[in-house]
Amino acid sequence: MKENIIQQKSFLFAIRIINLYKHLTAKKKEFVLSKQILRCGTSIGANIEESIGGRSDKEFLFKLELSYKEARETIYWLKLLKETDYITITEFKSVFVEAEEICKILAKIIITLKGKI
């Protein structure tokens, strides 16, 4: 089965988050915020994958809404990392743009699905 765009983007985003986590723990010796962003940044795609295996439209919607919330939380931790100088503005913008794009795609899917349920 071919992956859809949100599956692809969330998977690639998770890889970026894992690499950011490695950078933060190895180079910056930051272990608290980095764990938070690792958890929520990788759970976006995990929840999307779970939604695909959902038993009903409501379960599908619920998992997508969880993904959206995790994406918003990821943005929060990114902002904190930037404002506390753990990541540069350039590093922030690069990941932030992807997180925002994932949020927009998920929001559109959720709105469309709510209209059908």
State where each predicted segment sits.
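Short, C-terminally biased terminal segments at protein or domain edges
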Residues: 1-50, 54-117
